[in-house]
Amino acid sequence: MRKYEVMYIIRPTVDDEAKKAVIERFNNVLTSNGAEITGTKDWGKRRLAYEINDFREGFYQIVNVQSDAAAVQEFDRLAKISDDIIRHIVVKEEV
């Protein structure tokens, strides 16, 4: 199993309940595919360096996971489809 850092930005127009639901849904995507979440960080609402989909701000969420590639690939696939996530990146951590 490898260690990954997943960072995603939730669009700023969602309310607090919907934001919590998005975070829980994507954490469940990782854990249901065999990933172990080793840490999460909520960076809160931050200004973006440039406009993404007409948004100037977004809610940043960072998740550290230990998993096989399949869980991260499933997260990546669903994050691309989701309208609530405006940008995401998955980085494999060096050992």
Swiss-Prot record:
<dbReference type="GO" id="GO:0005840">
    <property type="term" value="C:ribosome"/>
</dbReference>
<dbReference type="Pfam" id="PF01250">
    <property type="entry name" value="Ribosomal_S6"/>
</dbReference>
<dbReference type="GO" id="GO:0005737">
    <property type="term" value="C:cytoplasm"/>
</dbReference>
<dbReference type="InterPro" id="IPR035980">
    <property type="entry name" value="Ribosomal_bS6_sf"/>
</dbReference>
<comment type="similarity">
    <text>Belongs to the bacterial ribosomal protein bS6 family.</text>
</comment>
<dbReference type="GO" id="GO:0003735">
    <property type="term" value="F:structural constituent of ribosome"/>
</dbReference>
<dbReference type="InterPro" id="IPR014717">
    <property type="entry name" value="Transl_elong_EF1B/ribsomal_bS6"/>
</dbReference>
<keyword id="KW-0694">RNA-binding</keyword>
<dbReference type="GO" id="GO:0070181">
    <property type="term" value="F:small ribosomal subunit rRNA binding"/>
</dbReference>
<dbReference type="GO" id="GO:1990904">
    <property type="term" value="C:ribonucleoprotein complex"/>
</dbReference>
<dbReference type="InterPro" id="IPR020815">
    <property type="entry name" value="Ribosomal_bS6_CS"/>
</dbReference>
<protein>
    <recommendedName>
        <fullName>Small ribosomal subunit protein bS6</fullName>
    </recommendedName>
</protein>
<keyword id="KW-0699">rRNA-binding</keyword>
<comment type="function">
    <text>Binds together with bS18 to 16S ribosomal RNA.</text>
</comment>
<keyword id="KW-0687">Ribonucleoprotein</keyword>
<dbReference type="InterPro" id="IPR020814">
    <property type="entry name" value="Ribosomal_S6_plastid/chlpt"/>
</dbReference>
<keyword id="KW-0689">Ribosomal protein</keyword>
<dbReference type="InterPro" id="IPR000529">
    <property type="entry name" value="Ribosomal_bS6"/>
</dbReference>
<dbReference type="GO" id="GO:0006412">
    <property type="term" value="P:translation"/>
</dbReference>
